[in-house]
């Protein structure tokens, strides 16, 4: 990316490991951490990537800031994204799926929360076969989505967008797989 590194800092914030083993108590701690990020940015608009619709609903149901959240289903993505884009701050788009194909320039998105490292569902036969051929296959797919997520709010050299990762999977995943990221992305960590 030709954009200045300082305009898009990416950082991990200790929270909880977000995976199928996470307890309700841990997920409530995850919501609390996201609420802290939202609460400190009440004059801005942001996006929270949740990977799943179930996690998006859990967040919206338990967040102090649920009234500021724009949630969509697989059927009304474009409509809800448009409502969010037109909204005045504070506003938060909670989505598992606007990782590509959507731009949120300037004031449309000034912070992003990566709620979970975006690993693909690895239970299918095809992805299992590809993973057997290349042990980094799912990590590469996750990295590609993460890079796309982090870039939704930085669309020009003058854009500024903070990116927060609140999944403690990051602690082992980034050191192990950082070489899969483009160098310009690594420079922002």
Language model: regions and residue ranges:
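Conserved interdomain hinge at the start of the Helicase C-terminal
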Residues: 12-51
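Conserved helicase motor "Helicase C" RecA-like lobe of SF1/SF2 P-loop NTPases
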Residues: 46-78
């Amino acid at each position: 990316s030709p954009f200045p590194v300082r305009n898009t800092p990416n950082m991990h914030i200790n929270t909880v490991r977000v995976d199928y083993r996470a307890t309700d108590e841990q997920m409530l701690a995850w919501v609390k951490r996201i609420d802290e990020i939202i609460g400190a940015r009440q004059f801005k608009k942001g996006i929270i990537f949740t990977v799943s619709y179930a996690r998006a609903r859990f967040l919206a149901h338990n967040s102090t800031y649920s009234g500021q959240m724009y949630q969509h289903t697989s059927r009304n993505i474009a409509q809800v994204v448009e409502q969010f884009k037109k909204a005045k701050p504070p506003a938060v788009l909670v989505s598992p799926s606007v990782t590509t194909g959507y731009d949120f320039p300037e004031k449309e998105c000034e912070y992003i929360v990566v709620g979970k490292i975006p690993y693909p569902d690895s239970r299918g036969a095809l992805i299992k076969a590809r993973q057997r051929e290349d042990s980094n296959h799912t990590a590469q797919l996750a990295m590609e989505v993460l890079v796309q997520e982090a870039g939704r709010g930085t669309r020009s050299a003058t854009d500024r967008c903070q990116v927060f990762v609140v999944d403690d999977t990051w602690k082992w995943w980034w050191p192990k797989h950082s070489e899969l990221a483009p160098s310009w992305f690594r420079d922002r960590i």
